[in-house]
Amino acid sequence: MADAVSNIARGNSTWRDHQDAWENLFAAEPVRQLKALHDQFQLRYCLTTNWTGLLDKAATLNVLRLSGLGFVASNLHARWEVDRGHGAVRRSDQIEAWLSHHSDQHDQWVVLDSEVRGPDVLNWPENLAAHTVSCCSDVGLTGFEAGAIRERFLQLQPSQKN
């Protein structure tokens, strides 16, 4: 993958020259699970991935679209990535800073992340931990995690009077 992006950046190839890499970048089941959640809740996305430090927005959009996540590319929040500057080293600090600048999100958000070990995750603030769903990094989003996200968003919806 890194070679493909590097070759594209140097002008030695185009995005479409690496279609096989994009098609296999994300496993089909996690993409299906995320698409089902997207269709149900009309999600918007902010990325915390390290990719945002390597790719600009145009490149990120290309990777998302070519790898089957066009619905994510089309629904990125206007501030589509967390700010990695201003001394925020831990991902939890980056997410909290993003949320503090986007109070319009209220509690209408969920962090979906791979299970990462270490002090950054173990010491997440309680308010972030309550909104976080972790999936196995070698498996991705399964029906189990998607169910937890669905339950969280259903709890956030205003109750309907009959």
Language-model segments: residues:
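C-terminal cap/substrate-recognition subdomain and adjoining C-terminal extension
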Residues: A58-N162
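Conserved short-loop catalytic and cofactor-binding motifs
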Residues: W22, T48, D83
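Active-site neighborhood of HAD-like aspartate-dependent phosphohydrolases
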Residues: M1-Q40
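Acidic-and-aromatic substrate-binding clefts and catalytic sites of carbohydrate-active enzymes
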Residues: N24-L25, G53-D56, R84-H86
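Generic, low-specificity signal for short hydrophobic/alpha-helical stretches with a mild N-terminal bias
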Residues: R16-Q19, Q42, C46, H131, ...
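Substrate-recognition element of Asp-dependent hydrolases with the DxDx(T/V) motif
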Residues: F41-L61
